[in-house]
Amino acid sequence: MSHDPTPISDNPAEFTLDPVIAARLKLNDAGLIPAVVQAVDTREVLMMAWMDTHALAYTLATRRGTYYSRSRDEYWIKGLTSGNVQEVTDVALDCDGDTVLVTVHQTGGACHTGARTCFDADPLLGPGQ
C-alpha cells in the first residue's frame, strides 16, 4: 500500500526561511529584497521582482518562482494563473546580501504582458546609439 505525501501548500505565508539564510539577507524597510530572474539556457535577464522571506522560503522549498506583489499586496506564484511557469534551478545571494539571482527554466513569457522578458524591446541605449 502506497502512502501519498502531504501536499505542499500553495500559501507562501506558511513557509519560514531557514534562520541561517535569513541572517544573510539585507531586506529593505518594507521587508523585501529584489530578485533578478535569469533564463538558465540563454542567461537572458527576464524580469525583476520583489521577495520577502516567505516568498524566498517557498521558492527554495518548491522550486517555483514566487514573488511578492507590492501593488496587489499579495504573493504571486509565477504561472499559477497564466501557465507561464518558472521552474527554479538556482538561487544565489549577491555579495552584499541585498539582491537574489533566481535562475529558471521559463515556460512562456516571463512578463505579465506575455513577452519573454519584462525589459524594453526599444532600449534607451544600445550598440551604435
UniProtKB/Swiss-Prot annotation:
GO cellular component term of the entry, any: cytoplasm
InterPro entries in UniProt: PRA-CH (IPR026660), PRib_AMP_CycHydrolase_dom (IPR002496), PRib_AMP_CycHydrolase_sf (IPR038019)
Reactions this protein catalyses: 1-(5-phospho-beta-D-ribosyl)-5'-AMP + H2O = 1-(5-phospho-beta-D-ribosyl)-5-[(5-phospho-beta-D-ribosylamino)methylideneamino]imidazole-4-carboxamide
Residues in coiled coil: none
Pathway as given in its UniProt record: Amino-acid biosynthesis; L-histidine biosynthesis; L-histidine from 5-phospho-alpha-D-ribose 1-diphosphate: step 3/9
Single Gene Ontology BP annotation: L-histidine biosynthetic process
Cofactor: binding comment: Binds 1 Mg(2+) ion per subunit.
Alphabetized UniProt keyword annotations: Amino-acid biosynthesis, Cytoplasm, Histidine biosynthesis, Hydrolase, Magnesium, Metal-binding, Zinc
Subcellular locations according to the entry: Cytoplasm
UniProt superkingdom: Bacteria
Cofactors required: Mg(2+); Zn(2+)
The EC number(s) this enzyme carries: 3.5.4.19
Record-listed Zn(2+) binding positions: C95, C111, C118
Pfam families from the UniProt entry: PRA-CH
Residues reported in the UniProt entry to bind Mg(2+): D94, D96, D98
GO molecular function: magnesium ion binding; phosphoribosyl-AMP cyclohydrolase activity; zinc ion binding
Gene3D superfamilies the UniProt entry points to: Phosphoribosyl-AMP cyclohydrolase
Self-association and partners: Homodimer.
Classification via NCBIfam families: PRK00051.1
Similarity annotation: Belongs to the PRA-CH family.
Cited function: Catalyzes the hydrolysis of the adenine ring of phosphoribosyl-AMP.
Annotated protein name in UniProt: Phosphoribosyl-AMP cyclohydrolase
Native source organism of the sequence: Corynebacterium efficiens (strain DSM 44549 / YS-314 / AJ 12310 / JCM 11189 / NBRC 100395)
